[in-house]
Amino acid sequence: VLVNKIVQFTKENNLDGVDVDLEWSHVTTGYSEFVLELKEKLSANSLGMTAAFPSETKYSLITTEALNAFDFINIMAYDYTGSWNPSAPGQHSSLNHAQRGLNYWKNTIGVPGERLTLGVPFYGYDFQNSTTVKSFTYASMVASDNSNADRDNVGNQYYNGRPTIRSKVKLAAENLSGIMIWELGQDSFTEYSLLETIHKKYTDYNVETTDLCGN
């Protein structure tokens, strides 16, 4: 019943497919069976299916068959630190983190690069003190000072600015199928937009982006 409702919702809203973003404790013994049933119904309706997975973790309960059912696997190469680890201030999504995630899924797990996308964050973490960490949007950093668009941190506020995003696009363009974003609503809808930065960098590589990016 759930699978049929998901497919119906996807079709009624003219979506391209479904992203299965069940994480950690939500990945239970029924996960793989659910994924395979969903894949069958989506494929019958010419719809795609992707999954978002941690940067360097493959859940043990996911079978090889279920893993291979995804059209794309989105590598969540962020949240290496955050509100759950207030005593460890620092960058939660560095270029090195992205390289590690790429290496894990492509080389250790063996997923072909054409089925992988690199997740980038449009948000950051403010390590206010040893017990308090709050998230913030990239848009808020740019709104406070336009020059923050080209930084990765201001004091104990860590995020991804345009130079790091460009480097990650280069990494993805050379090794993977594309970029995944969490999430668009956190972008600065100005000339400092990270989405526009991604679009321009891909254009440099003669890669056509979607209408969402203006190409």
Where are these predicted regions, by residue range?
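A structural motif
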Residues: L15, F70, G113, L176-S177
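Substrate-binding surface in catalytic domains of secreted glycosidases
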Residues: W24-N146
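Glycan-recognition patch characteristic of GH18 chitinases/ENGases
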Residues: V1-T10, P89-Q91, L95-N96, N103, ...
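Soluble or luminal CAZymes and related metallo-dependent hydrolases
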Residues: L2, G30, S93-R100, Q157-T164, ...
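Active-site groove signature of glycoside hydrolases
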Residues: V3-G30, I75-D79, M180
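Active-site and adjacent substrate-binding regions of carbohydrate-active enzymes
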Residues: D21-G48, F53, P163-G214
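Glycan-binding loop/region signatures in secreted carbohydrate-active enzymes
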Residues: G113-N175, E196-N215
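Short, acidic/polar
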Residues: V1-E12, S55-T64, Y159-A173
